[in-house]
Structure formats: C-alpha cells, structure tokens
Amino acid sequence: MQQGLKGSIAGVVAAATLLAGGILTVPHAMALEADGQYYSSKQPYVAPSEATTASYSQAPEGYETVYTESMARHGSRGLSSYKYDALLMKMAEAAEADNGFKSDAIKSEFMKNLKAITAANVENGYGMLTGQGADQHQGIGARAYERSKTLFDNAAKDGGKIAYQSSGEARATESGENFARGFNAASNNKLANSTVTPADPAGTGEAAAFDKTPNTLYFHKSENPDGTEKTGEAKQRADDYQNFVENDAIIAGAEQTIAENEDVKTASHDLLSQIFTDDFLAKLADGTYAWYNTVDGTKGGEANCAPGADPSKDADACGAAKKKIASEYDAAMDLYNLYIIAADM
C-alpha cells in the first residue's frame, strides 16, 4: 500500500512540467500502451479492438444465450466536487500574498490553469459525464447488442423486455442513458420501447426508463443520491460500512503510515518545490499554514462554491467544508488528483 501510493506521487513529480505547461492539454491516457501514461482511478476506459471482440468465446455447440446482463460504473467525468481545485486555489492565493511562488511565470501559469479547470467543470457540471464518458457508454451499449444480437432480435420478435437500473446518482443515470442510446442505435431501435416499467423512475425523459435501486447499487451510504434515507436492513448495512471505513483501526493505521512515510514526504516536497518556495512550504510543514474548503479557508467558515457556478443546479459546485490542506502530503495528493482528471475531461 505504501509502495503504491509512493509511486503515484513520484509519478506526478515527473509530470509536473506538463501541469505547469497546461493542465487541460494533457494527452488522453491509453491503457496498455507500452509508453502510455497511467492515471490510477481516473484511467480512461479504452474500448476493445475489433480483434479482441472477435476473439470472445461463442456459446458451445447446442447452446444459445437466453439472458445477458451488463453492470458498469459511470463513464469519464469531471471533478466530483469543488475541492481539489478549491483548496489549491486557497494555497495559491496564500503563496501569492507571501511571495511563495518560485517565479512570477510559474505563479501566472499555475493560477491560470487552476481557474481554467474550475471553469471547465462549472461548464460541464461537477461530477457529470464528459463527452468522452458519453462516448464510452454508447460504445458499450452498441457492443452489448452486437455480442448477443440473436438474443435481442428474438426478444424483439417475442415481446421480450430490457430492465434498466441506476443507483440514482446523476452521472450513473446519465451513463445508462448513453448505454441505451448506443444499444438502440446499433439495434435500429428494435427494443427502444420494450423496457420494464420502473417502480421508482430515476427521472424524466430518457431517465424515466431507469429504476432507482440505491439499496443495491448505492449500498455504501445511508443517504441516497436523491437525499432520501435508507431504512431497515439497507440502512444498517450502510451504517456498518461507513463505521468500518471511518473507524477501522487497520485502515486508520495504514493511512497514517502512508502519510508519515519519509519517502512519501520527500516525494511530496519534491513535487511542490517545483512550484512553491522552500520558505513557503516550511510554513505549511510546521503548521503555520492550513486551509479548509471554506470561503475564508478557516475551519467552520462559510460554504465555498466554484466561481460562476449555480449551486441550485449543481450542488457539487460547493465543496465539503471538512476537506483541508494541512501538510505537504495533503497538497501533493490534491495536486495529483487534480492532474489526473484531465485525462477524462
């Protein structure tokens, strides 16, 4: 675990020049390339080649497909909320006031890039699919039809129906809508109107075909994406899971070990020192500086929302106030997490 995280941070050190040169122009990562770049959890999904799909096993002789199911996570998205960009802007503003940038050119480029990626996420919607994410799921839907063409064609003739489900998270439903678009385009809309009526529709329009099933697909939190609360066994499972994540001694110990690892600290400093002065970083390291994701950067301050965003339409444009930068490690991880989202934008 320590080694994996250290590798992630060290990887950003090598990529810091790209960040300084323009975060929004990072080339899209391509999985399996010998010289490809890798972005951990934000590594974009790469569609299989025709040769790969042609190599998939067929049903054994004498057998035929009678049922198929596709379960997928959401596609490429923007930042989940206003947090990494928000906190790094707080840090940048403090550095500007304290002469903490290595040079005026670095300051100008860094702040320009921060503002640009915030603006891009405001325009796209925090946490929502990007065009790349929509394309991914349309392709998955089309390939699902081609893979089981006979099954679906027979279902269209025999009155069969497709059941669509979503966790209720907006980006998940949006992903499903794009899956359906790809599927229906590939099948010439043979089953476009042959869907199971949902017990709890995920929305209107295309989303109306999706049944919200958060007890299954969003089991890990007691509060559902639509703001309702789980009840009964579903709530107990969610509470047990959250208690495990937040209070398990092994997890806490592992996180502390990573944060206190000297190699990780060195990698964090090496990354940040390409942008900020040692004097400024020393104040972060000794506790002089700390920033919370609030309007004034203090603990308990007012909610901090992305410039130009409409919180009534995009609640995620106002970040969680508990998020903070209180160490070089925190800042390096925020910078890394901001950097890797570019591959999905």
Question: Over which residues does each language-model region extend?
Answer:
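Secretory targeting and sorting signals
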Residues: 1-31
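Long, internal stretches of domain cores in catalytic or enzyme-like folds
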Residues: 32-345
